[in-house]
A protein has these predicted regions:
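Flexible interhelical linker loops that connect adjacent transmembrane helices
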Residues: 264-294
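Membrane-water interface segments at the C-terminal ends of transmembrane alpha-helices
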Residues: 7-41, 50-163, 191-216, 243-262, ...
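Short helix-to-coil transition segments within interhelical loops
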Residues: 163-192, 359, 437-458
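Short cytosolic juxtamembrane segments of multi-pass membrane proteins
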Residues: 270-281, 361-362, 528-545
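Glycine-rich helix-loop "coupling/hinge" segments at transmembrane-helix boundaries
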Residues: 113, 212-238, 476-504, 538-541
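Membrane-helix interface/capping residues of multi-pass secondary transporters
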Residues: 52, 169, 178, 211, ...
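Peri-membrane helix termini and adjoining interfacial loops of integral membrane proteins
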Residues: 34-45, 116-128, 218-227, 268-275, ...
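Short amphipathic alpha-helical coupling elements at transmembrane boundaries
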Residues: 45, 90-93, 126, 167-175, ...
């Protein structure tokens, strides 16, 4: 009879519990600090406020339209990008991956330059004698900006799902003569389906909680989201109770949607191998033309706003801005925050997924979803509420620190966790399903498994998740807006100061530098695993060692 006492908590569950406890405790502490610092307010009066319900309806409607307009075209664009190889494809994929985390002020500046009433398209229509009736303000402008930010990200996630389809499935389908709708339905759709709902839920939450985009392009109180209403409640009315109630409504809506998407998305068994650049033997000219049109339309959506930022940034004040020490101080501060936040984000995300995938493999899907839901809590928590809660919490306890580096790095790391979760969730689950039995038979666990199996098998997804987290942190403005000053400024904060002091030419140069920095950092991090790195390469060799 066995006498060895079993541990109360198995080892693989400890990382996820620690990470989930940390994230939930931080979010609740920030929320409660805001709630308890609010004066007594009649909650019933707030719930009966007609403007509150208008904001809620508009937030839902624009988020639904934004998610639908982002995900539906991304399905066809991802299939086109998977089938085609052309010069600049790698650069286009990097652009698709980083548009979501581009600094909002930079992207909105480019969108207005192209689609504004005095923009490039308006000038072109005027020369052609056509009336330009489109306005980039209001619901149309918000949807345009949200599609610009989110459709490329959805495309990248769906392309990753297509690349994970085992080559054996494609070969069997080709031998059976399966093509068109049947090929999509039986081969591609099962893999796309498990990524579509989580991606749509992520985009819905991003648009539901949109702040800077709606602030810039909303055009008035008729186009206001919950996050913007929270900002107004804190900045203009200083009504913390109203802000806390709005934040609670947003968290309930977003977390409910995430839980529903996780329940509906089905896991499928992993295949044997993947083949990059599959060539369909039944390819034809019509398919090539359709794919070419889709890729061209995507380029016409993405490139003009970025070109506008580049052209406006190359002005006569370029050299004088580069010679300013303040610019380089802000640049190095942004890099320090980005790298620190990115590494912390990846560590917490892997801890969450390490435990949640083991729960899923043991048929405890609900417990695994609960762990992952804790990581999505930060996305549901409005950034301005999180930052304000930290400010009040520190001010009422230990006092505000002299340097805001630690607060900004940790807050940005938490806010990047949902992005890293979406990138790493399926790859980590696939690796576990593929190598769990091998690791158990060879007694590879803990740090040894992390070193010899996970880090080798997940080189590319880890690099992509780190790139997302770093670029998102380098372009963040919401947290720095509370703690930034003349001694602590990042590039977005410096850009905000330039715009506020009506130095538009200097601001255009700073926006260009910020754009170049984001693209260079993303490219550098994505190249870290090596050009020929595969998701599962080297694992069998590592296990044999």
């Amino acid at each position: 009879m066995a006498t060895r006492r079993q541990p109360l908590i198995v080892g693989w569950l400890i990382p996820g519990l620690c990470a989930a406890t940390l994230v939930v405790a931080v979010a609740l502490a920030a929320f409660m600090a805001l709630w308890f610092n609010a004066p007594q307010t009649d909650i019933r009066a707030l719930l009966q406020d007609s403007y509150l319900w208008h904001v809620l309806r508009f937030s839902f409607w624009q988020a639904f339209l934004s998610a639908a307009l982002s995900v539906f075209p991304a399905i066809f664009l991802a299939r086109a990008l998977y089938r085609r190889r052309f010069p600049g494809r790698v650069a286009l994929l990097r652009l698709c991956a980083m548009t979501l985390v581009l600094p909002v002020l930079v992207a909105v500046f480019g969108i207005l330059t192209v689609y504004g009433r005095e923009g490039w398209l308006a000038s072109l229509c005027d020369r052609l004698g056509i009336e330009w009736a489109f306005s980039p303000y209001g619901l149309k402008g918000i949807l345009l900006a949200h599609v610009f930010f989110n459709m490329p990200m959805a495309t990248r996630l769906l392309l990753q799902a297509l690349e994970n389809i085992p080559s054996e499935q494609r070969q069997v389908a080709a031998q059976l003569g399966m093509q068109g709708w049947n090929f999509f339905r039986f081969v591609e759709w099962p893999w796309l389906r498990r990524q579509i709902l989580p991606a749509a839920a992520l985009i819905f939450m991003l648009c539901f909680a949109s702040f800077a985009t709606v602030l810039s392009l909303g055009g008035g109180p008729q186009a206001t989201t919950i996050e913007l209403a929270i900002f107004q409640a804190l900045s203009y009315d200083y009504d913390p109770a109203r802000a806390a109630l709005l934040a609670l409504v947003q968290m309930v809506c977003c977390l409910g949607l995430v839980l529903m998407s996780q329940r509906l998305s089905k896991a499928i068994a992993p295949g044997i191998s993947q083949m990059q650049g599959w060539r369909d033997p039944q390819d034809n000219l019509r398919r090539k033309l359709c794919d070419g049109v889709l890729i061209t339309l995507a380029l016409l959506l993405l490139l003009p706003p970025l070109l506008a930022v580049i052209i406006d940034g190359m002005n006569s004040g370029f050299s004088s801005v580069l010679s300013q020490p303040i610019l380089w101080q802000a640049l190095f501060t942004s890099l320090r925050i980005a790298v620190g936040a990115g590494l912390i984000c990846i560590a917490i995300t892997m801890m969450l997924l390490w435990s949640s995938r083991e729960l899923r493999l043991r048929n405890r899907a609900f417990a695994g979803q609960a762990l992952e839901l804790s990581g999505m809590l930060i996305l549901a928590m409005p950034g301005i509420v999180l930052a304000t809660g930290f400010f009040l919490l520190l001010n009422n306890t230990v006092g505000l620190p002299q340097s805001a580096d630690g607060i900004v790095i940790f807050t940005n790391a938490l806010m990047a966790i949902p992005y890293a979760l979406k990138v790493l969730e399926n790859p980590m689950l696939d690796v576990a399903e593929r190598y769990n039995k091998l690791c158990q038979s060879l007694n590879i666990n803990g740090l040894n498994r992390l070193r010899y199996i996970e880090l080798r098998a997940l080189k590319r997804p880890l690099a992509q998740a780190l790139a997302f987290a770093c670029v998102l942190s380098i372009g963040d403005f919401g947290v720095v807006a509370l703690f930034g000053n003349d001694d602590f400024r990042t590039l977005p904060f410096y850009l905000y100061q330039q715009i506020g002091s009506y130095r538009s030419q200097d601001g255009a140069v700073t926006a260009l530098i910020l754009l170049i920095l984001c693209f260079a950092l993303f490219t550098l991090i994505e190249k870290l695993p090596g050009r020929h790195s595969q998701n599962h390469s080297g694992c069998g060799k590592a296990a044999s060692e």
